[in-house]
């Protein structure tokens, strides 16, 4: 008699480059949360839960590298609980949680609070800590203490570190415990009041623009600092063609550099804001069609490692206002993977999408990578 906790997934095609069953159509038997058998055909029994999906696929559980669940401080936008539900509904089994909240997540106790709030949920949450105390960009936070509590990465997120000396100290300090420093590349001094990408569209709309230069200067600075300190850095979301080229050069120089972009930057561009659509207002801004194409090519060539949702929810009443006063950011974790499957398969194969939305994020964070193989935990997305 089979255990009632068994789940039999019928006739799905495996998409997992680390699995011996990659691109094969199989049945997968899950027993007590572990993959117990994979075969071309497994006989079902009455007390098994049977899962059948027409033309279905199974891949390692997706991981959303950049999400903001807004708790504590902005629970009216979203809570950890509702964020978990959104991520699971989007097919994710893990997320990286951004720290720039009110209060900033800059101490061991804040990391512990986040971990405790997520206990007992099927979603793996890796909270990021801030680089600086209070996220104010002036003094290093308690990075190692936060690391011991479960923070694997550090970033000031929406308040990018403007002080080169602080970034240098962060990269140097993180080397002591193999922590990851994440940069959101934006030199705010270039265009502190920008609303969207600076170009033909912003001029036609009469809006202050954010030039690609603001991103590219910051990337050049942080790559130089990383090289000097022999450190490790990840650029969270890049948006321009020149950024792709600069990071490609750094990888060719064997620097420990990785980067990601958002699903929105791969599918849309600044022309989609022509009707003042606040849903497309984000940081970094959507840039030109040429930049959009360069990002896709960057993924194909392995320069861009991660596709993230860049999930930043806001309540409707502050979104449905005039474009200049609408906040940056929008929802994403519940729709990022469906968007990728709908809009990107003409450019990227499914295995590449899985790598950038499951395997690569976990590799960069140095956390366990799910594998579709007998004896491994059933951390899967169907």
Please provide the spans of the model-predicted regions.
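N-terminal metal-binding scaffold of metallo-dependent hydrolase/deaminase domains
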Residues: 1-45
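Divalent metal-coordination and catalytic microenvironments
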Residues: 12, 33, 55, 66, ...
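Active-site metal-binding motif and surrounding structural segment of the metallo-beta-lactamase
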Residues: 42-58
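Metal-associated gating/positioning segment near the N- to mid-region
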Residues: 54-118
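Active-site mouth loops of central-metabolism enzymes
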Residues: 65-78, 126-139, 208-212
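Alpha-helix-loop-beta-strand connector modules within alpha/beta enzyme cores
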Residues: 108-124, 172-183, 335, 339
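Histidine/acidic residue-rich metal-binding segments in metalloenzymes
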Residues: 141-307
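His/Asp/Glu-enriched, well-ordered alpha-helical/loop segment
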Residues: 204-230, 301, 306-307, 312-382
